[in-house]
């Protein structure tokens, strides 16, 4: 008997430290894994429920005779899923913790001091722990990934939605089937990720065009751009890019003409002032003034050419009259001139009246019959006829008498 008692004491001493360690490790893991105060209190409740479950489960073993203490110690030792659930911070929703943790606490209170087991509560707590452990194994990809409905939104915000949300629904269904009080929270858990598997498909369909555009642009393909407002007009100009012509209003044209009359060239401050007052850009005002100056220069040149032509016409008529008055005096003083002198005079007149422009040359050719050279030529022909017939000569001699 003494040996058996010593064996029991040694066995109890050998097993008690793991029990204390397991009892302390679960609350420590729960406290360190939780950030919110409410979830911390729920974690304490969950720990109480687990301890209550263990005490309730070991109470029937204490009533039996101590025939197999090793089997009893093995039954009391925590199972690997429970350790995994404790270290992975497996916690349901806060409301869920209030109900389940409270039940576990009551079960622990009854089972601890009175050594009285409640089979229904103990079975529900054990099933809940097993289902939570299974859910933790299925969802434990991220740190704290096996948390309940309260942890899912935070987990989705930090790590994104898990690809397989059906494991959470399966764990919820298992827990709801074990205890009727746990069934209210799982439609919310299922509703938290109803369209979640389709999210990657939607993202892929939405980003397909952008991805295709980026790949094509990096590959060097020419992609269609947004059509310009004058793309059709540009295509009709044989590939030439031409800006549309600016349509000025009548008020703008009047003001621009007024400014052009005041000054043909605008300074930059004045150009800015005119452009601002007329709701135009400085480039538009500058180009309008350039075009207006070119038009003004062309009109000025045309007026000068018309004035020169008029002066030539007047000069040609006056020269013909003067030549007719001078010729009789020359004939009286010097006699009939030689034919070579007449030709040289005509050539000098042609060189003096010549103009590089064709229209003026044509005008000069039209005016040649009225020019001095033409009259001299006519007189020379008369003189040549007079040279051939000597009788008209005496007719000129009585004139000086």
UniProtKB/Swiss-Prot annotation:
Residues 37-78, 101-120, 299-401 are annotated as: Disordered. It comes from the Eukaryota. Keywords: Acetylation, Disease variant, DNA-binding, Homeobox, Nucleus, Phosphoprotein, Transcription, Transcription regulation. One of its GO terms (molecular function) is DNA-binding transcription repressor activity, RNA polymerase II-specific. GO terms for biological process: central nervous system development; endocrine pancreas development; neuron projection morphogenesis; spinal cord motor neuron cell fate specification. Pfam families: Homeodomain. Expressed in lymphoid and pancreatic tissues. The modification Phosphoserine is found at residues 77, 79. GO terms for cellular component: chromatin; cytosol; nucleolus; nucleoplasm; nucleus. Residues 56-65 have a biased composition (Low complexity). Residues 241-300 bind DNA. The modification N-acetylmethionine is found at residue 1. Residues 391-401 have a biased composition (Pro residues). Residues 355-366 have a biased composition (Acidic residues). Residues 40-55, 101-111 have a biased composition (Gly residues). InterPro entries: HD, HD_metazoa, Homeobox_CS, Homeodomain-like_sf, MNX1/Ceh-12. Residues 302-314, 343-354 have a biased composition (Basic and acidic residues). It is found in: Nucleus. The keyword Transmembrane helix does not apply. It is linked to Currarino syndrome: The triad of a presacral tumor, sacral agenesis and anorectal malformation constitutes the Currarino syndrome which is caused by dorsal-ventral patterning defects during embryonic development. The syndrome occurs in the majority of patients as an autosomal dominant trait. Transcription factor. Recognizes and binds to the regulatory elements of target genes, such as visual system homeobox CHX10, negatively modulating transcription. Plays a role in establishing motor neuron identity, in concert with LIM domain transcription factor LMO4. Involved in negatively modulating transcription of interneuron genes in motor neurons, acting, at least in part, by blocking regulatory sequence interactions of the ISL1-LHX3 complex. Involved in pancreas development and function; may play a role in pancreatic cell fate specification. This is Motor neuron and pancreas homeobox protein 1. It comes from Homo sapiens.
């Amino acid at each position: 008997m003494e040996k058996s008692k010593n064996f029991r004491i040694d066995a109890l001493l050998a097993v008690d430290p793991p029990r204390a360690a397991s009892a302390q490790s679960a609350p420590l893991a729960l406290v360190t894994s939780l950030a919110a105060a409410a979830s911390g209190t729920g974690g304490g409740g969950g720990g109480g429920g687990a301890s209550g479950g263990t005490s309730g489960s070991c109470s029937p073993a204490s009533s039996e005779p101590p025939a197999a203490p090793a089997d009893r110690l093995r039954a009391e030792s925590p199972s690997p899923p429970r350790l995994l659930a404790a270290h992975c911070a497996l916690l349901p929703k806060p409301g869920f913790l209030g109900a389940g943790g409270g039940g576990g606490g009551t079960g622990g209170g009854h089972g601890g001091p009175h050594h009285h087991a409640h089979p229904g509560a103990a079975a529900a707590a054990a099933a809940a722990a097993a289902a939570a452990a299974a859910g933790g194994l299925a969802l434990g990809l991220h740190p704290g990934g096996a948390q309940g409905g309260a942890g899912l939104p935070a987990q989705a915000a930090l790590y994104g939605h898990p690809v397989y949300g059906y494991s959470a629904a399966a764990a919820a269904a298992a827990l709801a089937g074990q205890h009727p009080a746990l069934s209210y929270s799982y439609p919310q858990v299922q509703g938290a990720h109803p369209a979640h598997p389709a999210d990657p498909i939607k993202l892929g369909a939405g980003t397909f065009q952008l991805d295709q555009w980026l790949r094509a642009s990096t590959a060097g393909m020419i992609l269609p751009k947004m059509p310009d407002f004058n793309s059709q007009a540009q295509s009709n100009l044989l590939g030439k890019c031409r800006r549309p012509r600016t349509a000025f209003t009548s008020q703008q044209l009047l003001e621009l003409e007024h400014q052009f009359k005041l000054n043909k060239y605008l300074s930059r401050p004045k150009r800015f002032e005119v452009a601002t007052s007329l709701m135009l850009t400085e480039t538009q005002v500058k180009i309008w003034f350039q075009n207006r100056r070119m038009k003004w220069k062309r009109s000025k040149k045309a007026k000068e050419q018309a004035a020169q032509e008029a002066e030539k016409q007047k000069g040609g008529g006056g020269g013909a009259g003067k030549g007719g008055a001078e010729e009789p005096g020359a004939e009286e003083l010097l006699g009939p001139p030689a034919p070579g002198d007449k030709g040289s005079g005509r050539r000098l007149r042609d060189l003096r009246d010549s103009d590089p422009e064709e229209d003026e040359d044509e005008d000069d050719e039209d005016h040649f019959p009225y020019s001095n050279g033409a009259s001299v030529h006519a007189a020379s022909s008369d003189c040549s006829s007079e040279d051939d017939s000597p009788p008209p000569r005496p007719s000129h001699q009585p004139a000086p008498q």
